[in-house]
C-alpha cells in the first residue's frame, strides 16, 4: 500500500502514524524534491492496481467532478489509468445536498466506483446516510473487485490510498480515526 495524505487529512493523523502502519513512505506534496527523480504523480498513478480515496469528502467529490488538479491526490487521480474507488463519509445533510448528489451522478458516469456511505450515527451526533462504510465492507468490495478482474491470488496487489479526515466514534468519548 502507498498512501497520499491530504492537507485536510493532516488535521487528523500524522504521516508518521501512516508510515508506521503501512511500512511505506507517506506521500504528501505534489512537488517533493526528495522524490523528484524517484516517483511523481504519474508514477504513483501507474503503480497501483486500484486507487482508493478513503474517506471521500463532499469537497473532494466536487474537485473530482470539476477536474481540479491542485494537489498530489487530485493529480494522481486525473493521471490514473486504473479504477478509482471512492468511500464517501460526510454529514447526512451534506450527503443529501443536491450538489453532492449531482457530483455523485457525474462521478458514476465517469466510471468511479463507490462503497457507501452507510446509515448510522455521525460524529456530529446526527443519524442518517453519510457514515463511512466499515473496513469489513470495503474489504469485501475489494475482494469481489479483484475476483471479477481475475487477478490471481498470489499476485502482490498494489493499492494507493488517499486519506482525509474522519472519526468513527465507539462511544461518546472514544473514537477511531484515520
Predicted feature locations:
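A cross-family phosphate/adenosyl-ligand binding-site feature
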Residues: 1-84, 91-178
Amino acid at each position: 500500500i502507498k498512501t497520499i495524505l491530504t492537507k485536510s487529512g493532516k488535521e487528523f493523523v500524522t504521516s508518521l502514524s501512516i508510515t508506521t502502519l503501512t511500512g511505506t513512505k507517506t506521500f504528501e506534496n505534489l512537488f517533493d524534491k526528495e522524490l523528484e527523480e524517484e516517483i511523481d504523480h504519474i508514477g504513483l498513478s501507474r503503480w497501483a492496481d486500484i486507487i482508493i480515496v478513503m474517506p471521500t469528502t463532499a469537497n473532494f467529490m466536487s474537485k473530482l467532478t470539476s477536474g481540479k488538479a491542485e494537489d498530489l491526490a487530485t493529480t494522481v487521480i486525473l493521471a490514473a489509468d486504473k479504477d478509482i474507488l471512492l468511500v464517501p463519509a460526510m454529514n447526512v445533510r451534506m450527503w443529501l445536498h443536491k450538489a453532492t448528489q449531482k457530483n455523485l451522478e457525474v462521478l458514476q458516469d465517469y466510471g468511479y466506483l463507490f462503497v457507501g456511505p452507510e446509515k448510522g450515527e455521525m460524529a456530529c451526533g446526527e443519524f442518517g446516510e453519510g457514515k463511512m462504510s466499515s473496513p469489513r465492507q470495503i474489504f469485501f468490495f475489494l475482494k469481489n473487485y479483484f475476483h471479477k478482474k481475475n487477478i490471481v491470488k498470489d499476485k502482490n496487489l498494489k493499492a494507493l490510498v488517499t486519506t482525509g479526515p474522519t472519526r468513527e466514534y465507539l462511544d461518546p468519548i472514544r473514537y477511531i480515526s484515520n
